[in-house]
């Protein structure tokens, strides 16, 4: 007898494969809908699914059929209106539509196909082909991670991991092996008893002897236990090394008085998108939140996104604090260090060259990637031009982009973290 063991991850959801095939087929429609959803959603509404509409004309299956036009001779049974040789006028073309015109008794069409993608699928499409650039495998002593995988069957294990089917199968095989000869003798004894009762009903001594033998064999068979400790089988799980990269992301946000509420909202959206991306795609990553005005301080996630504290503008305070935290907690030989900075570009004039020097001399030589987004519809100011010098010196690990409105967040985010081809 053969056994089929279904170890697919989606074994209980048989339609998952078909759904994945469908999502691959209409990937362009879904990606476009996801991009539109990201640009219109609120700050706290980034992790929900989305309703996708696909035009009916795009879901038609290719079929073989007769082409339009041409001449055909067709006999319609039961037709009393026309006779042989008469020409039937072509029907007027009609089509369904969704316009605002008057109702009609002709024409037909097809509504758009609408379906829902889950939260997981939404985030998959949102962060598709994105990654942290220049991520290097850096080893930490004693910090290896492991994942639990199935490694067959064991005779010992935790009762919660008992494999019932394999246990019963083993017990059945053991009972057959231990009682096989007794069962064969029992069948022979029963056949002999039936013969004696039929052919020699008066031979009481032999009949009693056979009956005693049957009882003895039956007792021997029943003494074989239904289940023995030898039969117990357990699912064996082992820990498999799972190499991982240690990374830290510094999030630096300007909350000075020059940042309007709309500008702060765009900055928060950018960082929430970054935060979701990091938490979803990387198991071993730490996030350091830094808010700054005239002074900078490290805060938790709640205060970073929702604190109302404000003040003047000295951008270098955030960079100095970042450098101090790097030196204190994140050795460069063990950590991949990343940073993302958001500001409206306003800064105390004498401070912008200081920011450039800190980046070039104290931060950029030790980080994998640094991104700067300037949120302003106006012309760039001194800070942007100082950062351009940083970009020239570190063209592979420094990037800067401008955000004008919330609609620019997702395209700029994808451009900053687009997966790069490695030659």
From Swiss-Prot:
Q: Show the PANTHER family listed in the entry.
A: UPF0229 PROTEIN YEAH (PTHR30510:SF2)
Q: Which Pfam families match?
A: DUF444
**HAMAP family reported for this sequence:** UPF0229
The species this protein was found in: Ectopseudomonas mendocina (strain ymp)
Q: Name the family the entry cites.
A: Belongs to the UPF0229 family.
What InterPro entries has UniProt attached to this entry?
Answer: UPF0229
The name on file for this protein is UPF0229 protein Pmen_4018
Query: Source organism lineage?
Result: Bacteria, Pseudomonadati, Pseudomonadota, Gammaproteobacteria, Pseudomonadales
Residue span of region Disordered:
65-108
Coiled-coil regions in this chain?
none
